[in-house]
């Protein structure tokens, strides 16, 4: 039976998040969908071209409402605070409008990426209606804030944790993308918790042979490619030391496909160390083009900072990398490490040791082409 479904998300098309697929799937089942989101500005911090004003549009049975907010800008703490709060207040006002003037929704789904404020909206909506509420929890607060040193005060962390626990109590079910997160959620939430694993982007599964990208990559180099957000949680400081290790031999070339808060700082550090000649930054790339870019790669790179909460997280890009049939070079622990090792689809450095990582990459480079390709096929 078709339902009326209200979806809150911090990110939506043209921003590249899994919620885009979920909306398509739910919409294809004749459900009436309303997506409440903001003007896209992630990860560059600037509004996307042709998306600079609040607007609403209807596509068959899907309504999308883009609410106003202050863009992330350079990603500094003050700009992020303005970005978070401006969208939060826009959401609260719009939720009041929905509750008072719009026909009741049967289900509310919250796609939670930072900030957690997005998860508060069903509390307001439930003043007027009593829908089933689902939280797709992809970013565990306040631990994530603590892990990337955004908040260092233990008192503030404790306060935020109490707010999160209070908010959870309004949900009927929480969806998690990693089994490792279940124990964290169970300590706060007594209702239903369901494992909802990530999947490879449909564009990856439907690779077009017509896609052609020209990259000026030096010949006779082993190319390691990273795609996605270039942020603080990706542990790029360790990677700088690894890039430095290979600098004398000049046999590895690094390609970074994406954008993010840490990108400029990362490039600055590479330049200071005189390593920039071994790297290429493409900037933001539509996910549809990732398969074409990956054809230049001998291996795909994946990393997360060494932190308890990140060690229990399964990065969404892991499924994408596996679907690309490329060997994986990973710096992480936990569930992601287990998947890569058990599938024999690449190498993993779990001790946050750049020298160990460098030696493993060196061994990977020395593999016969057939064995290297087999790692990708295993994925």
Ranges and model annotations:
Residues 257, 264-291:
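Nucleotide-activated donor-binding/catalytic signature segment of Leloir-type glycosyltransferases, i.e.
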Residues 117, 124-128, 154-174:
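Membrane-proximal helix-turn-helix segments that form the acceptor-binding/catalytic region
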Residues 1-58, 243-246:
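N-terminal subdomain of nucleotide-sugar transferases
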Residues 217-234, 240-243, 255, 376:
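Conserved donor-binding/catalytic core segment of Leloir-type glycosyltransferases
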């Amino acid at each position: 039976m078709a339902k009326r479904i209200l979806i809150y998300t911090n990110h939506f098309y043209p921003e590249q998040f899994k919620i885009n697929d979920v909306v398509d799937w739910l919409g294809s089942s004749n459900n009436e969908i309303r997506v409440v989101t903001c003007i896209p500005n992630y990860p560059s911090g600037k509004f996307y071209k042709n998306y600079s004003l609040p607007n609403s549009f209807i596509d068959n049975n899907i309504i999308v409402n883009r609410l106003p907010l202050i863009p992330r800008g350079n990603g500094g703490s003050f700009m992020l605070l303005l970005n978070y709060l401006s969208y939060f207040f826009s959401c609260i006002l719009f939720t009041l409008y929905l509750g008072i003037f719009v026909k009741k929704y049967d289900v509310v789904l919250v796609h939670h990426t930072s900030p957690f404020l997005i998860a508060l909206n069903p509390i307001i909506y439930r003043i007027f209606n009593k829908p089933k509420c689902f939280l797709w929890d992809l970013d565990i607060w306040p631990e994530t804030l603590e892990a990337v040193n955004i908040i260092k005060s233990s008192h503030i962390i404790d306060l935020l944790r109490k707010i999160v626990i209070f908010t959870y109590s309004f949900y009927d079910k929480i969806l998690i993308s990693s089994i490792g997160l279940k124990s964290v959620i169970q300590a706060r939430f007594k209702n239903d918790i369901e494992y909802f694993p990530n999947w490879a982007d449909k564009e990856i599964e439907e690779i077009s042979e017509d896609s052609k990208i020209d990259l000026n990559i030096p010949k006779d180099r082993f190319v390691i490619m990273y795609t996605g957000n270039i942020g603080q949680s990706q542990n790029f400081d360790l990677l700088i030391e690894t890039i430095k290790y290979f600098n004398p031999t000049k046999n590895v070339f690094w390609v970074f496909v994406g954008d993010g808060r840490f990108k400029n700082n990362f490039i600055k550090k590479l330049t200071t160390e005189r390593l920039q000649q071994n790297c290429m930054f493409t900037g933001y790339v539509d996910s549809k083009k990732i398969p074409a870019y990956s054809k230049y790669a001998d291996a795909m790179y994946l990393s997360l900072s060494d932190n308890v909460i990140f060690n229990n997280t399964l990065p969404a890009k892991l499924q994408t990398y596996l679907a690309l049939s490329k060997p994986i070079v990973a710096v992480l622990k936990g569930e992601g490490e287990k998947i890569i090792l058990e599938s024999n689809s690449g190498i993993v450095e779990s001790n946050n040791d750049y020298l160990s990582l460098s030696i493993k990459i060196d061994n990977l480079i020395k593999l016969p082409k057939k064995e290297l390709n087999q790692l990708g096929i295993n994925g």
